Amino acid sequence: VWLLTACNVSVDLPVVSSDSDLQFPDLAKTWDEGMPLGNATVGALVWQRDSALRFSLDRTDLWDLRPMDSISGPNNRFAWVREQVMKGDYLPVQKKFDHPYNQQPAPSKIPGAALEFSLEKLGSPSDVHLYLNNALCEATWENGATLKTFVHATEPVGWFVFENLPSSITPTLISPKYSTGGDKAGNSVEGQDLRRLGYKQGTIDEDANRITYHQEGWNGF
């Protein structure tokens, strides 16, 4: 699970700047340039997608590891790969690993989800600062509004708090799309379409203070 908690009261989160901090005048516009937060299990990237502030959420242990013939058997070992390299013939390795990986849906990393906050009324922040000493990201707006967010050092939990907002802001949970879009095969670099995994689309349940995403994976995972 990935638990992200909102704080609805003013909190004191003292920070200490360092020369290695990341600081920019606005949010990154692509996920791979987002402000990184996380520990060895869960992680988040803070960035802007269109007109929304987005937390891209993930876990390191979300994998579809259904059995595949291409990675089973006695040749599924590095020593066998080394033998082919020493013989000067790498094609058997490509046929065993690369070709099936590009053609079959698994094994595959499964994405987590995302949390979005509309910036339609609030606008984009004028300063985004990642404090490395404190593992805390702070976004500041010219009207005095702030966002502070961090991930627990050892637990799969994250927090965020908005302060001095001119109006309320409601998060939206965005789930990966497993049953929409095309099913065209990609490759090991570009990634595969999630529809090829064959999952039934998960459900999102909301109540007054909680949003929960339920997704069943292969073999009941």
Question: Model-found features: residue ranges?
Answer:
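C-terminal motif of bacterial Sec signal peptides marking the signal peptidase cleavage site
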Residues: 4-6
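Aromatic-residue-lined binding/catalytic grooves and analogous aromatic/hydrophobic interfacial grooves
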Residues: 11-221
